[in-house]
Amino acid sequence: MVLADLGSRLRGALSSVESGSDDEIQQMIKDICSALLESDVNVKLVAKLRGNIKNKIDESNVSKETSAMNKRKKLQKIIFDELCALVDSNVEPPKPKKLSTSTKTINGKKVRLSKESSHVIMFVGLQGAGKTTSCTKLAVYYKKRGFKVGLVCADTFRAGAFDQLKQNAIKANIPYYGSYLEPDPVKIAFEGVQKFKQEKFDIIIVDTSGRHRQEEQLFTEMVQIGEAVQPTQTIMVMDGSIGQAAESQARAFKESSNFGSIILTKMDGHAKGGGAISAVAATKTPIVFIGTGEHVGDLEIFKPTTFISKLLGIGDIQGLIEHVQSLNLHQDEGHKQTIEHIKEGKFTLRDFQNQMNNFLKMGPLTNIASMIPGLSNIMSQVGDEETSKKIKNMIYIMDSMTTKELECDGRIFIKEPSRIVRVARGSGCAVVEVEMILQQHRMMSTMAKSAMAAQGGQPGQPGNPMANNPQMQRMMQQAQSNPNFMQQAMNMLGGAGGGAGGAGGLAGMMNNPAMMQQAQQMMRSNPQMMQQAQQMMKNPGMMQKMMQQFGGMGGM
């Protein structure tokens, strides 16, 4: 997760408030300010934040609240609003639109006609900030959303720049334009943009040379490229690891190139990212994306409220739904088959294997967990590499199963235990690991069938007959009528199985947007529910008692 340490400290400061006394509130403010300063946020910005928080606490009469829970709610709202204001530039960046085209036959050939012009994006920034990689990431981002995107390499200054962009573009299957022979970047940029405009591309991204403020020749070249291609939007790519120095860098660049928005890169491995975000926001320039890794999919759209929600552990269910939808998992044949099986009231081991494969496609576990309310506290303690390794190991074990075994509901292993031994030997693992997978499959099967039954047999369509009742009352009624309800809730939160086991329930939940929205509603309706869930996940004995009260572990 981006800025995991800062998020952990902010959540710790908020959770330290129990009774809501003045001393606790003052200590909370002190801890929040210390965390921000250590993340390289400017001292003046932190001082302003501290003053705003104190003023709002006085104005909202927090101290007069008799309920400790109401005090915590008000404090969380105040902190949330002020942190959002800290990273919000209050400027809306331009958004590209698809070209509305019509087809006309000219001289026997079909030609696409459009009254609109392509959205041209020019990238600028210092050397080594990650412009070329960010160009490809942005192209992939828009391509997934149905835009026709082209890349133009106008970087003739750095050796290997065109090779890098070409390699990235081919890997991502994105059209590109560049030249090994033409030394004039202005000519390359102009010809590339004209080529893609004639072919009616929705978005054209132009990569330029990295430059420093002292290199007047390169800055002149940048201005000339801008005049040649007439960009709709100019994006400056900045290294997030420079912290609050981002402000002076952005101001210096803006004097020469009137860029409209910023992409912050390398935000996944540096503690100073918070300082960079707040510093850029102070220049009233919107941050449109943040780079969170080396892969082409590691680019997150930046929204202040969403970003702060993740930091504070509130989650971003809508963002998670959009992320899952962008992967087009619903078009996968294996996923379609799984849905059909669940409709028929069955869930095979192959379906379970498909769910595990889909889960790996979603990206690092901590990034996904940060979008689910309350999970970032727990999953921040789990390594992405270790978790992915466990999930892959589960897939390897299932690869050692026969077609007959994969197509069954797991009962064949109960009837013929010798199959478990054979699968263990074939995959080079212990018998107990195979048994754990079968156990997780049974839990996932129960959850999938129950979710389908609750939605009237239609995946992704909420159909709860008690929708008009309060959320907690509905939850309790479900718990009473469904012995496996608590187990399913723990599965949705990534628990109940421990380690890689919890991934099955989480993957199933993320393939079902309606279930994710219901989970978020339950969390919001009862703030104590998440705390209780976390305590249960940390205390296996407590959770076991809860399971026994609700009728065992689902037939395990």
UniProtKB/Swiss-Prot annotation:
One Pfam family in the UniProt entry: SRP_SPB
Ranges where the record places region Disordered: 450-470
Alphabetical list of InterPro entries matching this protein: AAA+_ATPase, P-loop_NTPase, Signal_recog_part_SRP54_M_sf, Signal_recog_particl_SRP54_hlx, Signal_recog_particle_SRP54_M, SRP/SRP_N, SRP54, SRP54_euk
Region described as M-domain: spans on this chain: 313-556
Substrates-to-products reaction catalysed: GTP + H2O = GDP + phosphate + H(+)
Keyword Signal tagged: no
UniProt main location, coarse: cytoplasm
Keywords, in A-Z order: Cytoplasm, Endoplasmic reticulum, GTP-binding, Hydrolase, Nucleotide-binding, Ribonucleoprotein, RNA-binding, Signal recognition particle
GO biological process, one term: SRP-dependent cotranslational protein targeting to membrane, translocation
GO molecular function: 7S RNA binding; ATP hydrolysis activity; endoplasmic reticulum signal peptide binding; GTP binding; GTPase activity
Gene3D superfamilies given in the database record: P-loop containing nucleotide triphosphate hydrolases (3.40.50.300), Signal recognition particle SRP54, nucleotide-binding domain (1.20.120.140), Signal recognition particle, SRP54 subunit, M-domain (1.10.260.30)
Subcellular location: Cytoplasm; Endoplasmic reticulum
Region (G-domain): 1-312
EC number: 3.6.5.4
Subunit structure comment from the entry: Fungal signal recognition particle (SRP) complex consists of a 7S RNA molecule (scR1) and at least six protein subunits: SRP72, SRP68, SRP54, SEC65, SRP21 and SRP14. Interacts with SRP101.
Entry-linked HAMAP family: SRP54
Comment on protein domains: The NG domain, also named G domain, is a special guanosine triphosphatase (GTPase) domain, which binds GTP and forms a guanosine 5'-triphosphate (GTP)-dependent complex with a homologous NG domain in the SRP receptor subunit SRP101. The two NG domains undergo cooperative rearrangements upon their assembly, which culminate in the reciprocal activation of the GTPase activity of one another. SRP receptor compaction upon binding with cargo-loaded SRP and GTPase rearrangement drive SRP-mediated cotranslational protein translocation into the ER. The M domain binds the 7SL RNA and the signal sequence of presecretory proteins.
NCBIfam families given in the database record: SRP54_euk
Known function: Signal-recognition-particle (SRP) assembly has a crucial role in targeting secretory proteins to the rough endoplasmic reticulum (ER) membrane. SRP is required for the cotranslational protein translocation for ER import and preferentially recognizes strongly hydrophobic signal sequences. It is involved in targeting the nascent chain-ribosome (RNC) complex to the ER and is proposed to participate in the arrest of nascent chain elongation during membrane targeting. SRP54 binds to the signal sequence of presecretory protein when they emerge from the ribosomes.
Similarity annotation: Belongs to the GTP-binding SRP family. SRP54 subfamily.
Protein name: Signal recognition particle subunit SRP54
Taxonomic source organism: Candida albicans
